[in-house]
Amino acid sequence: MLIFILFVILKIILGVITEFCRIYLFALSIRVFLAWIVTINWYTQPYIVLKKLTDPYLNLFRGTLPLILGMDFSSMLGFLFLECVIKLLESIYIEIIY
């Protein structure tokens, strides 16, 4: 009975973490899309909140790839890493269910 309860708790925790990663990936997508729009003032609401939420994560990947035609593609590494984490969590979640 205790093992069953632990599996249920683990399943809930993994589900919450996976959904958080998906929401964060969506926020990153919005951030990168809005970065292409030149007229956005990042120091007004609601953009500053999005910037403060996503910049610490994106800063981990900045400078890892050289600029290509003046564009920074290091955020793609952030997307790729977060997608891999989501896939890993989903596979663990599926293994726990079955």
UniProtKB/Swiss-Prot annotation:
| Endoplasmic reticulum is among the record's keywords | no
Q: Cite the InterPro entries for this sequence.
A: CCB3/YggT
Protein's UniProt keywords contain Transit peptide: no
Q: Where are the transmembrane segments?
A: none
- Localization in the cell: Plastid, Chloroplast
Taxonomy of the source species: Eukaryota, Rhodophyta, Bangiophyceae, Galdieriales, Galdieriaceae
Q: Give the gene that encodes this protein.
A: ycf19
Q: Name one GO cellular component term.
A: membrane
Q: Could you tell me what this protein is called?
A: Uncharacterized protein ycf19
Recite the UniProt keywords alphabetically.
Chloroplast, Plastid
Homology family: Belongs to the ycf19 family.
Which GO terms of type biological process are on file?
Answer: chloroplast fission; nucleoid organization
Q: Which domain of life is it from?
A: Eukaryota
